[in-house]
Amino acid sequence: MALIHKRQALNSRGVDWSELPEDVIRLVLRRLRLSDFHRARAVCSTWCRVWGDCVSKPNQVPWLILFPDPAQIRRSCMLYNPQEEENVYTIQDLGVDPCLASCGTWLLALFSVLYRKGHFASKAEMMGYPSTDKAVVWIDEKTKDYVVACSWGGDKHAAFCKKGDCEWRQIPPLLGCSDIALKDHKLYIYYEDGSIGISDLKFVTKTAHVQLYPFRFRLGSFSPYDTIWTDYLDWKTNIVITISGDFLMVGCVLKRRDLSWLFRGDQAVILDLGITVQASSDIQGITRNSTYFSGLPSSQKDVFVFNLSSQKVQRLSSSSISSRPFSNARWLFPTSYFTMILFPNIFVFVQL
């Protein structure tokens, strides 16, 4: 309202905001906070048109969604935008079960009922979901086709399903799955012996075909079973897909000052999603050459950004987040419009 009153006052003095060049309006919109950004479309028809062009562009800054603590009576999810450090958006409670994966404006979680925009799921979508150790999801925002893959069990079995499937399709249990990442229809698998497998899930039969790469990846020459195990905390190796489609191995090792990594280029690693994203200097709100964590194996509540260049940990600065208990968190890339209308496009798979 304040912005509208200000516009009316300026118009009374003969100032016509619609006469501003569209490039200037676009620059102004890019510098506004989310709440002011959405109010700006009420200035005039020109501003509304430019605003629409800005909304259609994909969001390039990772947001954090925090899920409520089951012990809390009044439960709600929180959305944190790094561009607005002290602003936290509260949205409806999506349940207290862990979120397994995310893709754009979609979430994959274990619920007793499958919900999307207030409608119950079809029978095909209400499949039994394995008790999973890791899950990944990819969704085509235009067609709404989706692929979900997961790994579970002591032998690290893996399976996947696509939109329209009524049962899980097996991924050959070759060597024990340690980590998985999914981009488009390609599934990347990191096996326990250090080998890498890639499976194209776009055109498959009941069982996926996995192409193994001949090399082995190990973090240095160490194994988790060596005598130096006590020097390591939260040993974990993740496979990450870069912007160009190559795969990147991310080793998480603490209490080892003699080991360090540097990821070159204007990119950042979003470990939740298993991808890298553009992080150039002209994108405010994301730190280049860094890794975004939403929890460590020892603590799912340990959310931070690790800057590989400075070797420093940057924790969330918002007092509203640090003062409120939560069960777990996920990084995601919502669109501006999506975050303002109480989470449409929420997709949840069911455990019956």
From Swiss-Prot:
SMART domains recorded? FBOX
Pfam assignment, any one:
Beta-prop_KIB1-4
Locate the F-box domain: which residues?
Answer: 14-60
Please list every transmembrane segment annotated in the UniProt record, as residue ranges: none
Signal peptide as annotated in the record: none
PANTHER family associated with the record: F-BOX FAMILY PROTEIN-LIKE PROTEIN, OS07G0183000 PROTEIN-RELATED
Give the protein name, as stated in the record.
Answer: Putative F-box protein At5g14160
What is the native source organism of this protein? Arabidopsis thaliana
